Amino acid sequence: GTEDAPITYAAMPGERPVFSGGRRVVGWREEPDGIWTARVSAVAAGARYPRQLFVNGRRATRARIPNVGYLQLAGLINPYDRSDERNRWGFRFRPGDLSGSWRNSTDIEIVKMFSWSTTRLPVSSIDDAASVVHLGGSTGPDPRLIDWAGGRYYVENVFEGLDRPGEWYLDRPTGTLYYMPRPGESIDEIDAVMPLLERLVEFRGHAAAGEIVGHITLRGLTFEHADWPMPATGWPERQAQSSMETAAIYARGVEHCTLEDIEVRHVGAHGVWLERGCSYNRMERCHVWDTGAGGVYLGATTATPEASHNVVHNCYIHHCTEVHGGAIGVWIGRSSYNEISRCEIADMNYSGMSVGWSWGYAESTAHHNIVADNHIHHCGHRALSDMGGIYTLGVAPGTELRHNLIHDIWCYPGYSHASGIYLDEGSTGLLVEDNIVYRCTSNGFLLHYGRESTIRNNILAFSERNGVHRARVEEHISFSFEGNIVYSEHPFILGGRWDDPEHYVMDRNLYWSTGEAPISFAGRTFEEWQAMGNDRDSLIANPGFRDPEHGDFTLAGDSPAAQIGFEPISMADIGLYGDPAWVSLPERFEHQPDDPPPPAPEPLTISEDFETLPLTGEPAPLGGHPLRAVVNTEDRPELVGISDEQAASGRQSLRVQDVGDLGRSYNPHFYYTPGHAAGTTRLAFDFRIEKDSVWFLEWRDGGHPYHIGPRLSVSDGKLTVPGQPPIELPVGEWVGVEIIAALGDDSAGAWDLALSLPGQATRKLQKLPNNHKEFRKLDWLGFCSTADHATAFHLDNIELSTTRSEP
């Protein structure tokens, strides 16, 4: 079309055309075991292998193990060297979790869950004898992802997992489709559709060549049944599932086009993607739901050809990420001057919205984006983490997050966070104003790091961890936080780093906790906090909300919020509007259930002599890192590694080498996450110092801020513990250490130390005080070298045990 002669494809009045990219499956028969089967000829002929099935208008579940929840990795193929490429292409599984005898094993897919993303990789082979699965693709370049947080995963497309109503399996060699019917379904009335197409509408322009598709309107149409692609090597980790560049409605090089009253449903990839070279387009009153990946995507991961000036308005986008959990409800990549307004975005397994696609302070590629008047809720579902109701990246002048209602943002417990509004790496120059945020796992507002954003006139309520979190100290103003109300059930209003008041502005805020404990301002009283120059015109007072527990934050007429200049926030113009049937549409859909809580991890025990690999008995490789530890060497892995230079027993030990010029004074270091919450914990190890070794050992809990229990440090050839004179250490000889401490309700706030020096009787120091009286739980046990010069120390025979057999 052209400006003078636009083209419209529209439904006739009173009609609703439906375009399907699938084909009905017919010829069903019931097997003796109650499974229904049908033959899919295109599969038997080797022409296609669909990855979705919809039965009677509902998404059926590909047979998986387990049906709910996850399996856990047993370990890495090479646990001593995380950089070993084999660790990206496989892992050790717990005996019985997988089986090499499973049918069509190379069609099985392993879906690994990380913090903010997932991978979906095909199986290459399963070695039962070694309990190792080899994958047909790599998890990706990030070494953290090979076993993130214990390595959650599930197995999909496995015939042996066909054991729950609503599950299905497609046998590739025979073309036989197996389906376990849901209660109430009839084989004579089944309406089963398998998608064959990946894209249902494609606008194919070429902006760089000046070939633009323009002035086309689609109105009153429904598009359903699109499949998702599976490369031969699978889908490695990529944030926002951004590498899956396809959608049911997919556009490149498109301008001045409109999607109006369009429904996209039952599809496998993203719903709608206006990608490279798409500008001045509009989506209005569209319904996008039941997608395998994201809902609506604008722009791309590259900045050219430019995509800009697109509008998504009054749209209902929900129940997305059904297959690819790390995708987003509405995603704006390297794209500017877009508007997302009056939308309802709900039921995602990850973030509701994401804006920007550059990490750090590079020149902006996503600016002047407006996110306003949206209702964003029930995201995360405890499936992933490091997420937000609204999530941003990079320098973003002119970008506004304004007048949004955000609530029920829940992450997978145990690591990272879910925040209502999350300004991630480099987020700069944003305005965050007039938002209501409540019921989040972690924080109402979080800044990882960024510069000069304005946070004002917001309500942040009922976050489980903190109202406001600032994660990093930098030599500039992070943000101004003024005129906000922070409302909590607990006293922990602030989390993170707040020791540098010259680098942030906090004033004219109102704080309130419904609990009995006084509010803590990052471990300080309000008076101590104000003495730093913060919040001098702020109040601690009950704002007088009408019914905050049920989401009504209307202020009473005499609310003290008026004293800080707070402007009341109306929720009347948030979310969908129009005819009653459209506005009430969300009432027809149930919220997706949250993932079940993970099983409590078994308390970590360690028996590490640095001689052999526990799972196989193979020799521990020189240079290998300590098992089950997190190691930080600032990309110099040789600084912590197994060495044959010295040993307290056997032939090898662990060498920790400092070079004195790393970016962080506490590096190199490594730590374990024991998860000991009760009973008595014993740590024993041997160490050997050089004359100028400088290091410490600490036990910490997982609080924010954390509390320290037992601590010992070594410097100047001496060992220091609280309340005791320094103890001379022999240089170049091995010393034995034993620490015993009761935890949880049994804690006496003290610990015992036994020190075995060569040629001396064991020295016992009892009832040494914990560094913090609040310490009760061992979540972090670390060894840190803090020298400002080149030196080293050795460790051997690390033993960690607990009398508590379960957490």
Residue positions per predicted region:
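Predominantly extracellular beta-rich ligand-binding scaffolds that present long acidic/polar faces
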Residues: G1-D4, T8, G429-H550
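Extracellular polysaccharide-degrading/modifying enzymes targeting complex plant/algal/animal polysaccharides
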Residues: G1-R265, A531-A541, H550-P601
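Right-handed parallel beta-helix
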Residues: G214-H225, E255-H266, C278-A293, E306-T321, ...
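Short glycine/acidic-rich loop motifs that flank beta-strands on beta-rich extracellular proteins
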Residues: D227-T233, G268-L274, G292-L298, T321-I328, ...
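Carbohydrate-binding surfaces in secreted/extracellular proteins
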Residues: F610, F685, G736-L768
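Extracellular glycan-recognition surfaces and repeat-rich motifs
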Residues: T616-R655
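Secretory/extracellular carbohydrate-interaction modules
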Residues: A647-D716
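Flexible glycan-contacting loops in extracellular carbohydrate-active proteins
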Residues: R763-H794
